Amino acid sequence: DSPHYGERWARHWLDVVRYADARDLIQLPAERDFREAWRYRDWVVSAFDRDLPYDQFLTRQLAGDLMQPADPDQIDAESLVATGMLAIADFVPGDVDKEQMIADYVNDEIDLLGRAFLGLTVACARCHDHKFDPITTDDYYALAGIFFSTRLVPGPVKGNTPLVRAPLLSRVEIASIEAVRQHDQGRLVELRREINTVAER
């Protein structure tokens, strides 16, 4: 019943997935956009507070952007935000070999997936069959194929790369908010008139 239950247990999960609001600029000299990272953190806290079933907790973090709501006019913002786990992977831009850079990024995602979801060091199989766990290089590259099919958009680096932002509200919700805003603006104009009338007396 404590409002801090989700915060306490989310801390453990966020440590496992290496959550951070900022990066060490000595290690990563390029600017990174972490302004929205809090959304993922808050989603994890909320998931623990709501006792979200574990299968849904994992599925939304891996493929939340592919989960379609029943109503096509709605947006499943919660599932979009949950994919933040993949966005906070260790991405170091600037490697002269672009293919190597992407392969390293995919390796980091596979390592995260293996450690967080399976409790295994799957990334070892990038170079050789795992010495202790039943993970072969074939298994590794089967997983890697899934992550290689993902288009990487790292966000703005020194203002040169466009950041793709996904809407978290549907058009209907945006229209509703805009209607309330316009109503409130009209009411504000009326109140200012009344204030001016009283002030002139």
Predicted regions and their residues:
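Short, structured secondary-structure elements
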Residues: 1-172
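Long, non-membrane, amphipathic alpha-helices that form coiled-coils
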Residues: 167-201
